[in-house]
């Protein structure tokens, strides 16, 4: 399958990534991506950016080198109540927010606690995507989370990076994907790139989705406008006109 969108990418601003914003945009353009999301880690990530970085996206272009740019954040869930490490004032300015659990920002809890964190964060209207929920460090009740995502119109990410960096993720990712297929929940495939050469490349996630027969209509990033329409329907991207 050809993917035209990558919403989960990091720059050197995240502290442990290796390429700049412009290098990422150039690579996205080179490989034919139509939409690129820059979603650096929230400020509670060691080495991550401060809030001024996220509050200053107004200086950034909307399009560059033929690529539509989404300026967002992979925000850290910092408690089981679903609080994020960026305030509402910042959240409402962003084009896209991925909410993720990272063990350097919150201790892994019980299955019930981890599930509660994800259920609660989906009550936040600014959250668009749940990041890498197949991480075995944070066991969850996958079906409860997937059903809640459908109710709240939140996208479930299938994170290609998890297949390599989070050992044991493949089985859980497949379970999550099958549940999304069963309940007709939209998914988005993300590279979680920390260097530009990973952008737009989802081989392991794509192979798994082919294996389970994931319907293409449930995959948001196989067309340019699906993600843009999704975000505009949530009241975002007011400055962007869709052709």
From Swiss-Prot:
GO terms for cellular component: cytosol. It comes from the Bacteria. This is Probable phosphatase CLI_3563. The keyword Translocase does not apply. Its cofactor is Zn(2+). InterPro entries: Phosphatase_YcdX_put, PHP_dom, PHP_phosphatase, Pol/His_phosphatase_N, Pol/histidinol_Pase-like. Keywords: Hydrolase, Metal-binding, Zinc. Gene3D superfamilies: Metal-dependent hydrolases (3.20.20.140).
């Amino acid at each position: 399958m050809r993917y035209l969108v990558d919403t989960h990418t990091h720059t050197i601003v995240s502290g442990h990534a290796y390429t700049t914003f412009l290098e990422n945009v150039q690579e996205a353009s080179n490989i034919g991506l139509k939409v690129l999301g820059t979603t650096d880690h929230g400020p509670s990530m060691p080495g991550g950016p401060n809030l001024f970085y996220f509050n200053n996206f107004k200086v950034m272009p909307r399009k560059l080198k033929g690529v539509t740019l989404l300026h967002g954040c992979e925000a850290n869930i910092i408690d089981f109540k679903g609080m994020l490490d960026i305030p509402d004032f910042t959240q409402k300015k962003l084009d896209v927010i991925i909410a993720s659990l990272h063990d350097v920002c919150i201790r892994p809890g019980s299955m019930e606690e981890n599930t509660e964190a994800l259920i609660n964060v989906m009550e936040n209207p600014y959250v668009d995507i749940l990041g890498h929920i197949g991480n075995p460090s944070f066991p969850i009740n996958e079906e409860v989370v997937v059903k809640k995502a459908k109710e709240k119109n939140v996208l479930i990410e299938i994170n290609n990076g998890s297949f390599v960096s989070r050992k044991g993720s493949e089985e859980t990712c497949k379970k999550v994907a099958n549940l999304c297929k069963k309940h007709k929940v939209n998914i988005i495939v993300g590279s979680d790139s920390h260097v530009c050469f990973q952008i737009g490349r989802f081989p392991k996630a794509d192979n798994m989705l082919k294996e389970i027969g994931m319907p293409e209509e449930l995959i948001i990033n196989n067309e340019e406008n699906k993600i843009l329409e999704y975000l505009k329907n949530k009241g975002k991207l007011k400055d962007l006109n869709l052709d």
